[in-house]
C-alpha cells in the first residue's frame, strides 16, 4: 500500500504484463513436462527407477531460450548420454516462432536496418538477432520474387507503364550503376497491376528488352499505349518488342528537362506555362498554346524552347485516347512513391551481399507499395471500346 493508505493504480499495461508473465510460465512448465516425458520414453525409465529394460541414462540438462510472441522463454532441455538432447516438442534448432520471423521480414521490408532489427527484437523479445539471421529470414521473400516473375498475365492490358529509378547497389566490394526497372499496367478490370521488377541499366536496351520479353512470354497482350520516359535504350526496346504500340512520353519528365535549360528565376513561371500545355482541352488547343509559348520565350530561352518543341509530339499522344483517361496516362507519376520507398530502403541496407538479395528486397517493397492498387479502379477501360466504336462509325 502506498503512503497515505491508497492502493497503487492498476493499469491495463500492468495487467497485460502480468498475464504475459503468467502465460510464459505456463508455457515453460508445459514444455518441460513434455520434454521430460520424451526423455523418459527415450531412456526407458523414470527418475531413480531401476528397471532391466533401461536403454540410456540421463545426462543433465541445458538451457534453451525460445523467442515467442509473448516474449522470451527460458526452457530447461534434458539430455541423455547416448542420444544427447531431446527436442521433439521444441525442435532442436527451432529458437524463434513464425511470429518472430514475420516481425523480422516486415522490419526488413519497411526500412529497418539490420542493426535496428536487432535492437527491435531485443526490446520486444529480450534477445538480439544477428545480421545474418535477418538476411536468412528475408530469404523467405524469394517466393514473392518468383511468383511475380512467373505469374501468367491474363487479359488485355491497354496501358503499360515503364519506369526506372537509380539504386546505389553495392556488393562484392564494388558499386554498380544499376536501376530498378519497373513495369505495371492497367488490366481488363481497370485496375493497375504490378507486372515485373528487375535490375538493369536504365539506358540499356538489353535490360529493357529482357523485361519486355518476359512480360510477353507470360501473356501480355492488348497494349495500346506505353507510357515512359524518352530514354534511348527504353525507346529502342519498345520499338523492337511492341512495334505497333503508340508511345507516350512522360510529360513530367519533359517539363523537368525543359526547366533545366532555364535560369532559376524563371523556372516557376515557365513550369506553370508548360504544364498548361498538357491540360489543354484538346490537341489543337495544346498546339496553339505551344505556338504562343514559343513566341513569348524563343528569344530569351532558345534552348528550353528547342527542348520543348522537340518533345512536344511524343508528349501529346495521350490526346488520342478517352479524355477521362488523360490525367492518368500522360505521366508515370504513379510510380513516384514506389521509387522513393526503393531509394529509402536500399539506403537503409547500405550494401547487399549479392544482386539476388537486392532484387529480393526491391521486389518486396514494390509489392508492399502497390498492394493498395487492388482497392480501387484506376480507369474505366470500357471507354476505350466506346471510342473505337465511335471512330469506326
Roles of regions detected by a PLM:
Residues 86, 258-288, 292:
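Metal-dependent DNA phosphodiester-chemistry modules and their immediately adjacent helices/loops
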Residues 76-81, 88-94, 99, 127-128, ...:
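RNase H-like nuclease fold core
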Residues 16, 20, 24, 28, ...:
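Amphipathic alpha-helical transducer elements in NTP-driven molecular machines
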Residues 1-110, 114, 119-143, 147-159:
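Short, flexible loop/hinge motifs at secondary-structure junctions
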Residues 225-232, 237-273:
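Conserved beta-strand -> loop -> alpha-helix junction used to position metal-binding or nucleic-acid-contacting
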Residues 41-45, 107-110, 123, 127, ...:
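Conserved, well-folded catalytic cores of nucleic-acid-processing
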Amino acid at each position: 500500500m502506498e503512503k497515505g493508505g491508497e492502493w497503487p493504480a492498476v493499469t491495463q499495461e500492468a495487467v497485460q504484463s502480468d498475464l504475459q508473465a503468467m502465460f510464459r510460465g505456463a508455457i515453460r512448465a508445459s514444455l518441460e513436462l513434455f520434454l521430460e516425458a520424451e526423455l523418459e520414453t527415450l531412456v526407458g525409465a523414470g527418475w531413480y527407477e531401476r528397471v532391466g529394460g533401461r536403454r540410456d541414462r540421463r545426462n543433465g540438462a541445458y538451457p534453451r531460450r525460445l523467442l515467442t510472441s509473448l516474449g522470451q522463454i527460458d526452457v530447461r532441455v534434458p539430455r541423455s548420454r547416448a542420444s544427447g538432447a531431446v527436442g521433439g516438442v521444441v525442435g532442436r534448432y527451432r529458437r524463434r516462432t513464425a511470429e518472430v520471423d514475420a516481425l523480422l521480414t516486415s522490419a526488413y521490408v519497411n526500412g529497418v536496418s539490420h542493426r535496428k532489427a536487432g535492437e527491435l527484437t531485443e526490446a520486444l523479445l529480450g534477445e538480439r538477432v544477428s545480421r545474418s539471421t535477418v538476411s536468412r529470414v528475408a530469404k523467405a521473400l524469394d517466393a514473392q520474387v518468383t511468383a511475380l516473375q512467373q505469374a501468367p498475365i491474363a487479359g488485355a492490358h491497354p496501358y503499360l507503364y515503364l519506369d526506372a529509378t537509380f539504386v546505389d547497389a553495392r556488393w562484392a566490394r564494388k558499386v554498380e550503376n544499376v536501376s530498378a526497372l519497373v513495369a505495371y499496367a492497367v488490366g481488363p478490370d481497370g485496375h493497375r497491376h504490378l507486372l515485373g521488377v528487375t535490375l538493369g541499366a536504365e539506358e540499356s536496351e538489353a535490360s529493357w528488352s529482357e523485361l519486355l520479353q518476359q512480360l510477353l512470354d507470360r501473356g501480355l497482350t492488348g497494349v495500346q499505349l506505353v507510357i515512359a520516359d524518352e530514354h534511348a535504350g527504353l525507346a529502342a526496346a519498345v520499338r523492337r518488342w511492341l512495334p505497333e504500340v503508340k508511345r507516350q512520353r512522360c510529360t513530367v519528365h519533359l517539363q523537368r528537362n525543359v526547366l533545366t535549360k532555364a535560369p532559376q528565376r524563371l523556372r516557376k513561371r515557365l513550369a506553370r506555362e508548360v504544364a498548361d500545355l498538357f491540360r489543354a482541352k484538346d490537341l489543337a488547343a495544346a498546339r496553339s498554346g505551344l505556338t504562343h509559348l514559343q513566341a513569348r520565350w524563343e528569344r530569351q530561352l532558345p534552348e528550353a524552347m528547342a527542348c520543348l518543341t522537340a518533345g512536344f509530339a511524343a508528349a501529346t499522344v495521350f490526346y488520342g485516347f478517352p479524355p477521362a483517361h488523360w490525367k492518368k496516362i500522360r505521366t508515370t507519376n504513379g510510380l513516384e512513391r514506389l521509387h522513393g520507398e526503393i531509394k529509402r530502403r536500399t539506403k537503409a541496407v547500405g550494401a547487399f551481399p549479392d544482386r539476388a538479395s537486392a532484387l529480393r528486397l526491391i521486389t518486396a517493397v514494390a509489392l508492399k507499395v502497390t498492394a493498395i492498387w487492388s482497392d480501387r479502379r484506376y480507369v474505366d477501360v470500357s471507354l476505350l471500346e466506346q471510342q473505337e466504336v465511335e471512330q469506326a462509325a
